[in-house]
């Protein structure tokens, strides 16, 4: 076997079953193939048998739903996932292989078995070790679990491959993000996870396989699904949250890259393999696509373009993997460049394991080496926080790394950076910032007990003596529970310490969880509020109806969920309290929109849509926007939009990023197509106080 070459950051692994898009053939926006693809016919006999078994399963589920037993309520999703998978396959022709009929039968039989077990109080699938037919104890390796998603209330599956020891505690877990599989819907995913242990985790390790809401590289709703699956697994298995690695290959490699840079303090290691790490270069290299993005699309690329965030890997051990002749080696090459092209005193080499003469697969020898290195990283891992933090973000959506949290930026979609040093021999944290206007530092009671102050200065690349703390020094005593923290806010050019007893501000500002863009509303619990009557203009009504139905349909097809839908008359106070509201219609057709219309920065009258000093005819234009809900400023309100990427973007995961900023005016005289909801007459981001910016 030829000797492996090593470049620099860690990632890994498994064969991706179908995986990537079709290249230049998928660059024609006017001729877009469907995703998921059309299914194949199963026989009438197979369908009849599946429908009979599904009916039986649903009857037991209906009885279980009426139970007041807390265990039944908690573990019912472990049963419902089997019913939903086959129900969707039957209703939507989600069979792509003649063997899928048998897979559906197996899935239903397991669902029926679990339903009866839950009914009798025997949740056998929870046991890590079971008795086989001979009465011997054997490991229950492959288990499919389910949880109810906060996004839309649907049950979502994930797989567990469990190689932990009997009665083990504080177990290491690896999240494995899967490769692209346009035919990998719920049925196929569950059937595979019931029996397939590839990639096999290392001995003693639990591997978590998120469904990821289908085929989106674990972005947007898929990102939330991954974190929800992890949260559920930690509750159900003896996993140490500080011993979790993020991994994947192909599309899953892309997922691992962005989850690594966005959440650098969640993992003890990252192991991305192949895939992509940004949008524009990958689409040029892999897709041969001639990109002509709008200025706001380029801004929004920064949400998932990982090279901008490369600095964050300084605190996260990373092992990248590629085959030498795999075109997707480009992903790690780009990240290696980004890591090395940081300022001289911050740059580092990315560890990149390259398998010689290997295409799009994981070389067995490389896999062994990766596992060895991950085991070492796990072994030397400590619960101590890093003394040095280097953190960059472009949005308050991702605003923390370990003991540093950014609360406000000068401007979104420009890199905001914090470089902080907490020398245990010193009494002060030294902080340098760029494009940051408010931040906090927090240590637990057992972390760096000598720290008493924070010094903050502007960030300068290659600063010679960046530890200097001669000015802007802020002191704080340990809190009564011996934790330590300080919150600092910049007022003009002057930093000031925020009093811990300062009343919470009610000002409408961009903050973590309320920073946009439009797509962010669908990364939290949301509800559609449909029109109650006709609106002011027939053409607008027609467009609203079309886009509403499309948004409901595509959430189901692409994000594998079911939208909560109510009319304004059905809306309850708890809905306003708990959900981001996606309002459809205009102020005449939607009473909820009518209540808040005059409180939005964009006005919508019978004659015009008014954006500052710009006016657009209300007969032929409609606004889409996101804004803190005037009825509950802790939640969003969105007008007339679901997630903003469309059918053309389904064909390559690198395209699946937000397409519209905080607001846009849609010219309805141009019909919607596979890329846009109509012609975008104007669009922009709101400012940091959710105000309109001057026209460009």
Where do the model's predicted regions map?
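Gly/Ser-rich "nucleophile elbow"/oxyanion-hole loop immediately N-terminal to the catalytic nucleophile
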Residues: 164-169, 218-251, 261-267, 312
């Amino acid at each position: 076997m030829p000797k492996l070459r090593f470049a620099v950051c860690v990632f890994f692994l498994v064969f991706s079953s179908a995986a990537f898009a079709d290249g230049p053939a998928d660059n024609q926006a006017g001729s877009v193939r469907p995703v998921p693809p059309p299914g194949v016919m199963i026989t009438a006999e197979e369908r009849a048998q599946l429908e009979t078994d599904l009916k039986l399963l649903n009857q037991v589920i209906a009885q279980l739903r009426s139970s007041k037993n807390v265990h039944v309520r908690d573990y019912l999703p472990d049963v419902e996932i089997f019913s939903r998978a086959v129900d969707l396959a039957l209703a939507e022709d989600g069979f792509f292989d003649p063997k899928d009929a048998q897979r559906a039968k197996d899935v239903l039989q397991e669902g029926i078995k679990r339903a009866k077990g839950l009914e009798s109080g025997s949740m056998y699938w929870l046991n890590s070790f079971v008795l086989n037919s001979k009465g011997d104890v054997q490991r229950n390796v492959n288990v499919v679990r389910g949880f109810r998603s906060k996004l839309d209330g649907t049950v979502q599956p994930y797989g567990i491959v469990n190689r932990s020891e009997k009665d083990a505690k504080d177990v290491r877990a690896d999240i494995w993000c899967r490769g692209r599989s346009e035919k990998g819907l719920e049925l196929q995913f569950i059937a595979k996870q019931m029996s397939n242990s590839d990639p096999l985790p290392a001995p003693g390790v639990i591997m978590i396989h998120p469904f990821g809401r289908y085929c989106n590289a674990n972005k947007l709703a898929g990102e939330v699904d991954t974190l929800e699956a992890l949260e559920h697994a930690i509750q159900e298995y003896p996993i140490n949250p500080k011993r979790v690695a993020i991994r994947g290959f192909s599309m899953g490699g892309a997922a691992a890259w962005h989850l690594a840079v966005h959440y650098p303090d969640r993992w003890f290691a990252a192991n991305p393999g192949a895939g992509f790490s940004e949008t524009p270069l990958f689409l040029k290299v892999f897709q041969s696509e001639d990109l002509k993005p709008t200025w706001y699309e380029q801004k929004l690329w920064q949400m998932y373009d990982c090279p901008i965030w490369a600095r964050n890997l300084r605190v996260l051990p990373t092992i990248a993997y590629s085959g030498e002749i795999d075109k997707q080696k480009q992903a790690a090459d780009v990240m290696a460049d980004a890591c090395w092209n940081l300022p001289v005193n911050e740059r580092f080499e990315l560890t990149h394991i390259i398998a010689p003469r290997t295409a799009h697969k994981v070389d067995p020898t490389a896999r062994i080496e990766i596992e060895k290195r991950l085991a070492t990283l796990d072994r030397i891992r400590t619960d101590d926080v890093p003394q040095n933090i280097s953190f960059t973000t472009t949005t308050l959506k991702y605003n923390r790394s370990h003991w540093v949290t950014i609360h406000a930026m000068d401007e979104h979609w420009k890199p905001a950076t914090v470089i902080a040093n907490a020398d245990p021999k010193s009494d002060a944290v030294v902080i340098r910032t760029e494009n940051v206007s408010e931040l906090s530092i927090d240590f637990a009671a057992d972390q760096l007990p000598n720290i008493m102050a924070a010094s903050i200065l502007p960030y300068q690349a290659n600063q010679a003596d960046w530890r200097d703390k001669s000015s802007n020094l802020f002191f704080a005593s340990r809190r009564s529970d011996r934790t330590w923290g300080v919150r600092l806010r910049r007022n003009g050019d002057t930093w000031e310490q925020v009093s811990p007893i300062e009343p919470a501000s009610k000002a409408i500002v961009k903050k973590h969880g309320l920073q946009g863009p439009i797509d962010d509303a669908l990364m939290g619990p949301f509800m559609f509020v449909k029109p109650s009557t006709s609106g002011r203009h027939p053409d607008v009504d027609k467009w609203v109806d079309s886009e509403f139905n499309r948004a409901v349909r595509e959430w189901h097809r692409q994000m594998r969920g079911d939208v909560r839908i109510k009319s304004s008359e059905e809306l309850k106070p708890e809905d306003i309290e708990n959900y981001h509201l996606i309002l459809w219609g205009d102020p005449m057709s939607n009473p909820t929109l009518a209540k808040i219309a005059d409180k939005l920065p964009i006005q919508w009258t019978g004659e015009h849509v008014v954006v500052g000093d710009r006016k657009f005819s209300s007969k032929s234009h409609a606004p889409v926007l996101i804004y803190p809900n005037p009825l509950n400023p802790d939640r969003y309100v969105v007008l007339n939009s679901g997630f903003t990427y469309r059918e053309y973007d389904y064909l390559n995961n690198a395209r699946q990023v937000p397409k519209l900023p905080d607001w846009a005016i849609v010219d309805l005289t141009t019909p919607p197509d596979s890329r846009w909801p109509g012609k975008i007459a104007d669009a922009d981001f709101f400012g940091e106080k959710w105000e309109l910016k001057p026209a460009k």
